[in-house]
Amino acid sequence: MVKINASAITYTKGGEISKILSGTGFSIDTETLGPKQVVIQALATPINPSDLNQLAGTYASKPNFTSELDTPVPVAIGGNEGLYKVIEVGSDVTSYKNGDWVIPKMPSFGTWRTHALVTLDKPENPDPFIKVSSEDDKSIDLTQAATVSINPSTAYQLIDQFIKDWDPKGNDWIIQNGGNSQVGKFVVQIAKIRNIKTISVIRDGKPDQDQIVKELLDLGATKVITDKEAESEEYINKIVPGWVNEGKVILALNCVCGKSGSALVSHLTGNHLADYRSPHLVTYGGMSGQPLMYSSSESLFKNVTSKAYWLTANTKRNPQSKVDTVKKVLALYKSGDIKPVPFNGKEFNIKSTSDDYIKLFLKGIAESKTGKQVIVYN
């Protein structure tokens, strides 16, 4: 192997996605590979909502710009999540070998590219990858490895980070909106393993509502209700308390805000006078675009602790936490305790042109509202 013709999805500034993205061709000369360099080839690159926010210029984590693609001006490469195979290693590289499957450890790697030339042992990021498998290891498949970095890792940390004293007898509950999201589907699976009961809130009026409810129950949700039900006095004062009984709704996971987020607080169980355990409201998204408001009496008398969660911030603050979380999620896959959430795969021939590449990505972005899109390379 001497020269690799590669493609990347690039942009020079944030804005309207269909107008700012380009398909950029570039090449990698493996004959000049440095002793501490590796070449990786894409196996799968997801399209996530955070990627689109970053492209639009509305995301707090900014992209990295590079001149390594020989473009007239520095460009950013889209994407924060991706699975790659190591195909070339430098003479001094001992931590990776050809055939290893790796994912970027840090955000803003720029995953939407067919290949990358990466230098190891940089002071700012000495080991940029997490090894998740290899082509001769059949215990983890591509479907599991391709999306392990964000959604299941977020779900794992949401359950693990805020409540440290889960009731071992199974009397604790989680209530979450966005129940049909990728994160929501992993939350119910991981919670079930830990003997934590869950109430998943989904949007009312979806045509496939019965199918969604069945899927969530099959994954391990204890109860599934609609947002209208969650906001109703009957569910707040009678139905949900009847389910919970002597237990406690100790954690509310909010990715919607607005009325949906406010309703979660109403379902939290807390007594500031008698209970040392503070129920937690954790916000990790705001899909409604509306503010999160709830009454001062609920905050005071229930002793509600409100926290924000962001996987990107956790990873930047403590990169090892990302490594540890990914390894724990992979262990759950290997044991069969959790299963991957299906995504919509779009196949791309890695030898195709950069024009074909950008067309496929724009199609995937346009269809991302119908479910998670992942570019799968062959």
UniProtKB/Swiss-Prot annotation:
The source's superkingdom equals: Eukaryota
Q: Which GO terms describe its molecular function?
A: enoyl-[acyl-carrier-protein] reductase (NADPH) activity
Q: Does the keyword Transit peptide apply?
A: yes
What is the catalytic activity of this protein?
A: a 2,3-saturated acyl-[ACP] + NADP(+) = a (2E)-enoyl-[ACP] + NADPH + H(+)
Annotated catalytic residues:
59 (proton donor)
EC number(s) of the enzyme?
A: 1.3.1.104
Q: Where in the cell is it found?
A: Mitochondrion matrix
Show the GO cellular component annotation of the record.
Answer: mitochondrial matrix
Broad enzyme group: oxidoreductase
Binding of NADP(+), residues = 151, 180-183, 203-206, 284-287, 309-311, 372
In the record, biological process GO terms are: fatty acid biosynthetic process
Instruction: Name the major location.
Output: mitochondrion
Keywords linked to the UniProt accession: Fatty acid biosynthesis, Fatty acid metabolism, Lipid biosynthesis, Lipid metabolism, Mitochondrion, NADP, Oxidoreductase, Transit peptide
Which CDD domains does its entry note? ETR (cd08290)
* The keyword Cell inner membrane is annotated on this UniProt entry: no
Q: Write out the similarity annotation.
A: Belongs to the zinc-containing alcohol dehydrogenase family. Quinone oxidoreductase subfamily.
- Subunit structure and binding partners: Homodimer.
Name of the protein this chain belongs to:
Enoyl-[acyl-carrier-protein] reductase 1, mitochondrial
State the organism's lineage.
Eukaryota, Fungi, Dikarya, Ascomycota, Saccharomycotina
This protein's encoding gene? ETR1
